[in-house]
Amino acid sequence: MSLPGLELSQTSSEREFVPAPPTQITLSKGSEWRFEVAFGTAIRVKLLAGTAELFGTELAASQTYTFSGTKAAIYTWHGCTLEVSAGDTISTIDGLGSGGLNGEGARGYGAGGCQSEYTAEETPMVEYANVHFALEAMRQEAKATGKDGPRVLILGPENAGKTSVAKILTAYATKVGRQPIVVNLDPAEGMLSVPGTLTATAFRTMMNVEEGWGSSPMSGPSAVPVKLPLVYFYPLQNPLEAEGAVYRPIVSRLALSVTGRMAEDEDTRETGIIVDTPGILSAGKPGSLEIINHIVTEFASSERLYSTMMKNYDNKPTSSASAAASDERITVVKLSKSGGCVDRDAAFMKSVRESQIRTYFFGNPIPSTASAALSMSASSTTNITLSPHAQQLDFDSLAVYNYTIASSDEDEDEYDPSQFGASDTFLPGGRNDAEGPETKHAEETSFTSSVPGLGGPSGDDAASGSSAVPLKKVLPPAPNTLANSLLAVTHTAPNASPAEIRDASIMGFLYVADVDSEKGKIRVLAPIGGRVPPRAIVWGKKWPGEVVGLVG
């Protein structure tokens, strides 16, 4: 604004950023443009000439794509020309300004405001394409002989491009009419779900260029057909927690569901499975190889990892039931790491997780002209805005369970003042005399069944190993640490055994916005209206952990 008489102007936040004119980038055949965009900022990319793809999904000509909070690469087989320009500042929900998540959002000095961008001539895309053609040959053989299609397990260290390879192979398969099942076994990032989940999805249509894997069902239109993921909750940071005692059974349950789907769907059986794994399994830590063995048995890049895989699995027979009477063999192939793979620090990954959770409840705030064109919308841009339903619940009416596993990298303090307001610990005998013997026995049973190594109730539950499942029911009053965390609503009954709760798939997620321990109520956000179904609920206390600022 101007100061009268002095012809001076005061800078304002609205005038600080002046977008640079669009930049044209010409790529020769076999090269790719690599770029990084911070959260809270956006760039727009348009394909002016030639052909190009992002992680295997082809870009439409003359359509503008918007990217925010991503590290990606656009590859061309025959050469192309791109136009890159600065996008609008992303306004997040409830006053988290243009700075984005975790204080990020600094616009860079690259084309369109990229934090980093450059053109690379050497890429491993030819290797990835050769893998696709080899898989296609195996799929054609599977169709001719009636066998199962190839099952691909992708292993490698952190930030090696495993998920990128999975996207490329999936995109190429769908492009030729195949229908692969993609399995995500990495709880650090969600695939069509929130972090802390293990998912399996059958891909029948193209993936979304701007959103990666695409989107799951929602109450609204979608330019790209939605995907239907099968979701299991694993509220721990990595598979090695509790020596894999929780991770392995969930993987087995997920593999059983995938096997059942393939038995009923001829197209997915012929196409096969693509499994993406966490990088920590390839770091050589104790217990990693056992979990890899388990994954190979159920679903069946470093030199040391490659040598171990060659020694243990190359040309060895598979263990699947369908291969029992055949001569199927496991083949180990080493792929080059792309030079575009960059390290994703803890702050960036935290922003990724918060963005996935925010998108689950509130939709995608990034305006997209490409989606508007695909959806035949009258507006020039479109963004998907969802309205979650807020409601208060009596904590007493909920069956909330929590995994009682000490973190491997820190000693967690379980102290919560709300648990000691009306405690009966200091009464004679440490127990309320008004309680009957039935209540005492129920509490003893609950405690015994939640601690590994202690004898649980006899019968079927004991036989199934329920006493070894480190799940404990959270008793009233509601702990204050419940605020700003996720609750996973399972498909099993609230009084189910710990093993049944652990192995149950997920119906949906709730976000705890506030906790009133005195009144025994919690305020939650739900993706749909109506009463919360009477199901067992698992608390994501340890992972994905606390998400602050989702609501005001």
UniProtKB/Swiss-Prot annotation:
Compositional bias of kind Basic and acidic residues: 432-444
Keyword hit for Membrane: no
Subcellular location(s) per record: Nucleus
Annotated SUPFAM superfamilies: P-loop containing nucleoside triphosphate hydrolases (SSF52540)
GO biological process, one term: tRNA splicing, via endonucleolytic cleavage and ligation
Region (Disordered): 409-470
Gene3D superfamilies assigned: Clp1, DNA binding domain, P-loop containing nucleotide triphosphate hydrolases, Pre-mRNA cleavage complex subunit Clp1, C-terminal domain
GO molecular function terms listed in the Swiss-Prot or TrEMBL record: ATP binding; polynucleotide 5'-hydroxyl-kinase activity
Chain intervals with Low complexity compositional bias: 459-468
GO cellular component: mRNA cleavage factor complex
Main localisation: nucleus
Keywords per UniProt: ATP-binding, mRNA processing, Nucleotide-binding, Nucleus
Any Pfam family: CLP1_N
Binding site residues for ATP: E32, K71, N159, A160, G161, K162, T163, S164
Role: Required for endonucleolytic cleavage during polyadenylation-dependent pre-mRNA 3'-end formation.
Assembly: Component of a pre-mRNA cleavage factor complex. Interacts directly with PCF11.
HAMAP family, per the entry: Clp1
Family: Belongs to the Clp1 family. Clp1 subfamily.
Protein name: mRNA cleavage and polyadenylation factor clp1
